[in-house]
Design a protein with these regions (language model features):
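ALDH superfamily catalytic-core signature
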Residues: 1-93
Length: 93
């Protein structure tokens, strides 16, 4: 989970995986299952692995990056939806 602890907001965050096509589908399924189990919320609470993005501009930047990926033929297979019930800067991993 190279991006969960910092909500993807540091320069060493995992951005891409290069995976052989023979294992890509299985790896994708396993990663999606793992990310769907990430506890999101107040990072000061025990058991929470992912907190909010730093500010609303960071959320807008993330949404724009996801839209650019889609516009260029990419598929978002997990996450990327806002979580307003947690606060204005929470987004699914």
């Amino acid at each position: 989970f190279g991006a969960v602890g910092t909500a993807g907001q540091r320069c060493t965050t995992t951005r891409r995986l290069i995976v052989h096509k023979s294992i890509a589908a299985e790896l994708t399924e396993r990663l999606v299952n793992a990310y769907r189990q990430v506890p999101i919320g107040d990072p000061l609470q025990e058991g929470i692995l992912m907190g909010p993005l730093i500010h609303e501009q960071a959320v807008e930047n993330m949404m724009a990056a996801l839209e650019t990926a889609r516009a260029n033929g990419g598929e978002v297979v997990c996450g990327g939806r806002r979580l307003p019930e947690l606060g204005p800067t929470f987004v699914e991993p």
